Structures are given as C-alpha cells and as structure tokens.
Amino acid sequence: MGVRAQQKEKTRRSLVEAAFSQLSAERSFASLSLREVAREAGIAPTSFYRHFRDVDELGLTMVDESGLMLRQLMRQARQRIAKGGSVIRTSVSTFMEFIGNNPNAFRLLLRERSGTSAAFRAAVAREIQHFIAELADYLELENHMPRAFTEAQAEAMVTIVFSAGAEALDVGVEQRRQLEERLVLQLRMISKGAYYWYRREQEKTTIIPGNVKDE
C-alpha cells in the first residue's frame, strides 16, 4: 500500500472513530451530522465525500465493524475455552468485556436493530445472523446435535445475551456482575434444556407412539 493510500485509510479510520466517539446513552447515530463528524476527525466537511458517499454509508460501515469486532472476540473466547474452562462463563465474561470496552459499538447495534432505516435494520440483522451461525457451528461440533437443534439453541442464547447487554450498558460494576451471573444461569438452563429436548426426540424413535406426552 502506497503512502497516499495509507493516508486515505488513516483518514477513513479517523472518521469512523470520530462517529463512534460521539455516540452515547443520550445520542444516537441519527442525530450525528456530517460536519460534526468531520470536525472531530480533523478534516474539512467536503473531504468527507472522498471516503464515504454519505453519512448512511459511514453508519453501515460502523455496523459491520461492530459486528465483526464482537464475533472476533467470541472466536478468541472459544480458543481460550479449548485450553480449559467453562464454555458459558468464559463466553459471558468476554461479551461483558466487549460491552465495557466498546459501549458505543453495542449501542449502535441495539438501536439500529429496530431503527427507522431499512438498510440499517438489514445490516444489523445480517450481523446477528452471522453471530448465530458461528455459535450454531460451534454447538454442532461440540455437542454432536443436528443443525436444527443447534440453530434454535444459538438463536435463543443470542437473544438473551443481547437483552442482557442492553441492561449492562449503563449500570455500575456490582450490577453488571449480577447481570453476568444471571446470564450464565440462563444460558446454562437453555443448554441443559436443548440437550434434554434432543435426547427426548431421540428416545421417541424407540418408544411406542402415544406413550410420551408432548410438552
């Protein structure tokens, strides 16, 4: 990469970081202006268009980066798990670290998931589906259950994790610790329930129909 290309990438990075830095509990992406972001990044507003077509393209880039960042962290967590330790507790701790270190990235995913922009909603939905798919892959490999079961389990887990993350954004250390413990318990219950349901479905093939009540 030449010097000019490096400088362009550096400026593009500055714009993304500037936009993230202006998000908060009180301020959403929709309230940001091109001028504010450019000023924070240290460039003229007109220079913004050398890097992004408009503010929406910047926002979509931020959504992609937020989702990728979270998935990479969870992959690292699974690598740590391979060396020993609780799968669920290590994953929850890693997720809460992400919330603590990147609150605005998670805020963006939460808000745009149900925002007014169809493009943003679709982008967040894609990121969440990537997250679910990677978790389902892991569960299928580790638990030796059919894909339909691991996908259902992964979707339930991700839904609860995102809900807990929303609560964890603006609470103190002790409250976050309590949330973490509750989340570990909830995920273990889902995991046990998924395994029980799978075993129950397996047993149906060896039991005379009608002897087991549907729950």
From Swiss-Prot:
Location relative to the cell: Cytoplasm
Domain HTH tetR-type: 10-70
InterPro entries for the chain: DesT_TetR_C, Homeodomain-like_sf, HTH_TetR, HTH_transcr_repressor_FabR, Tscrpt_reg_HTH_FabR
One annotated GO biological process: negative regulation of fatty acid biosynthetic process
GO CC terms of this entry: cytoplasm
Pfam families: TetR_C_46 (PF21943), TetR_N (PF00440)
Entry annotated with the keyword Glycoprotein: no
UniProt keyword annotations, A-Z: Cytoplasm, DNA-binding, Fatty acid biosynthesis, Fatty acid metabolism, Lipid biosynthesis, Lipid metabolism, Repressor, Transcription, Transcription regulation
Cell division is among the record's keywords: no
GO molecular function: DNA binding; DNA-binding transcription factor activity
DNA-binding region of this protein: 33-52
Function: Represses the transcription of fabB, involved in unsaturated fatty acid (UFA) biosynthesis. By controlling UFA production, FabR directly influences the physical properties of the membrane bilayer.
Subunit details: Homodimer.
Full protein name: HTH-type transcriptional repressor FabR
Organism: Escherichia coli O1:K1 / APEC
Gene expressing this chain: fabR
